[in-house]
């Protein structure tokens, strides 16, 4: 995953890594992670810090080295991409830009995609995604529908 990063991104992450790696030994400990998190106004518990490290600590030595840090950053960037894709997809459906997808808008887009749906099928799709029951799909509901697969 880290191989999809540009040299510029890698250089930026190297700088960020150095900020975390207070003693410059090439690894980030829970203590160092805690220091940086607190300087950013966060107040993680020891257990939370351990969880954060364990999430990316692929060799299981209890610290994060630079390759592990890169993988973590690449993963975060990938998640952001898919969020942006979902936002774009929502805009495609939300023809009038009011922040909601109506049955008419859904039918219009599905028809353009070559999907001939009955009114009943369109209503059913709206009902499935419409968790607050207002008869249309807002962005949160759309995200829920897109990520529940």
Swiss-Prot record:
GO CC terms of this entry = myosin II complex
Where, in this chain's numbering, is Ca(2+) 4 bound? 130, 132, 134, 136, 141
Tell me the first and last residues of the signal peptide.
Answer: none
Instruction: Please tell me where Ca(2+) 2 binds in this chain.
Output: 57, 59, 61, 63, 68
In which residues is Ca(2+) 3 bound? 94, 96, 98, 105
Name any one GO molecular function: calcium ion binding
* Family indicated by similarity: Belongs to the calmodulin family.
Describe its function: Calmodulin mediates the control of a large number of enzymes, ion channels and other proteins by Ca(2+). Among the enzymes to be stimulated by the calmodulin-Ca(2+) complex are a number of protein kinases and phosphatases.
Name this polypeptide is given: Calmodulin
Organism, as annotated: Suberites domuncula (Sponge)
């Amino acid at each position: 995953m880290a191989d999809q990063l540009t040299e510029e991104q890698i250089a930026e992450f190297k700088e960020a890594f150095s900020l975390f790696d207070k003693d410059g030994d090439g690894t980030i400990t829970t203590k160092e992670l805690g220091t940086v998190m607190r300087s950013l106004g966060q107040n993680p518990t020891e257990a939370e810090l351990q969880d954060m490290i364990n999430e990316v600590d692929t060799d299981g030595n209890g610290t994060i080295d630079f390759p592990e840090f890169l993988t973590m950053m690449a993963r975060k960037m990938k998640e952001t991409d898919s969020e942006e894709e979902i936002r774009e997809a929502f805009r495609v459906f939300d023809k009038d830009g009011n922040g909601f997808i109506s049955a008419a808008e859904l039918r219009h887009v599905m028809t353009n995609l070559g999907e001939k749906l009955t009114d009943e099928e369109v209503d059913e799709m709206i009902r499935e995604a419409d968790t607050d029951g207002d008869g249309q799909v807002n962005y949160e509901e759309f995200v829920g529908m897109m990520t529940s697969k």
